[in-house]
Amino acid sequence: MKGLITTALAVLLLAGCAGHQTPAFSPTLDEVFATRRSIRAYEAGRTISEAEVRELLTATQNAPSWANQQPSNYYVAIGAEKREAVLELIGGNKERVINAPVFIVSTFERGKSGFFRGTPTDATGDFWGAYDNGLSNAYLILKARAMGFDTLIMGMRDADALRALFAIPDNETVLAVIALGYRAQDPATPAHRPLDEIAKFF
């Protein structure tokens, strides 16, 4: 009888421990905004699957764009060979992101956003494409944070070499390379301009 009681207590203890496991990372939208940072040091040895990157990029399909033109495209370096090649094309950022397991090249198709039948609708022209790509990238990095990942958007890149590496069509502008991984440390919260400085109410 004593043995049965001991066994029963052990089972209850294990069940209780199982019910108190650390919950999965599931932040609120405000927590995503508050914890997203441009990360310049990544944990080594950690991986991100293609399925996870696909889920991440699916979020960009919900980003708004000029007349729903959806000019943004992404080229994902997830294999070792392409990843190593990208590292050589991002200048001084190489050492900052050397442990990031994935790099995403962000482009937009010129002549789509801001154009009607091949003619720009206003003086903004292809800047609308860059604007839309920025919106799409914002969705990407926020979704990444919601999934527990971290990012760094890098403008320092050899666009011509990246175009050749990924066979990017000539009608696309290579805008940025985004590192994707896990932060090695929590950076300090940077100073932000006061709301009353950036917003005017009338």
Predicted regions and their residues:
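Bacterial N-terminal signal peptides
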Residues: 6-15
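Positively charged n-region of N-terminal signal peptides that target proteins for export
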Residues: 1-4
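Acidic, surface-exposed loops and disordered segments
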Residues: 17-202
